[in-house]
Amino acid sequence: MINEIRKDAETRMDKCVESFKGNISKIRTGRAHPNLLDGIQVEYYGTATPLRQLANIVAEDSRTLALTVFDRSMSGAIEKAILTSDLGLNPASAGTVIRVPLPPLTEERRKDLIKLVRSEAESGRVSVRNVRRDANDKVKALLKDKEISEDEDRKSQEEIQKITDLMIKKIDAALADKEKELMDF
């Protein structure tokens, strides 16, 4: 029973870490990367459709993304969706190809992005701690029902804490990498 609780907690904490990494991967660093446009939805025949389903996205060079639109009539809607996104990008259309140059990041914008990344990291840590609290509550319930001894309770809480510490270290490492990436480029 305790092993199940521990494994469940570890799985849920791992999902929190992966969610955090996914969130910060969408934050632009000044380097062109196709994943940068992942969050953009385009109005396609009355339905919000992910941009990836309407165009092939490639990094043309370190500062430019090129989108090859599958349906030429959608070029205008795709441009509008990129313009209205909060990424601060200005696309230029040339037939079926839309080029999206990435402006260099200003020092002020870098600092804002670092604040955003740190905020995401704190949210990730809080999520991990919430999972820890849930797991510890389940273990305490077992102790209260006299299904486990106090020694087993203490031991399992220590194991859950070790897992929590490991997951928070993963979040901190990803945070440090992203901060370095933002400041170096």
Curated annotation (Swiss-Prot):
GO terms for molecular function: ribosomal large subunit binding. It holds the Pfam family RRF. It is found in: Cytoplasm. GO terms for cellular component: cytosol. Its main location: cytoplasm. InterPro entries: Ribosome_recyc_fac (IPR002661), Ribosome_recyc_fac_dom (IPR023584), RRF_sf (IPR036191). One of its GO terms (biological process) is cytoplasmic translational termination. It comes from the Bacteria. Keywords: Cytoplasm, Protein biosynthesis. The keyword Protein biosynthesis applies. The keyword Cytoplasm applies. NCBIfam families: frr. Belongs to the RRF family. PANTHER family: MITOCHONDRIAL RIBOSOME RECYCLING FACTOR PSEUDO 1, RIBOSOME RECYCLING FACTOR. Responsible for the release of ribosomes from messenger RNA at the termination of protein biosynthesis. May increase the efficiency of translation by recycling ribosomes from one round of translation to another. This is Ribosome-recycling factor. It comes from Edwardsiella ictaluri (strain 93-146).
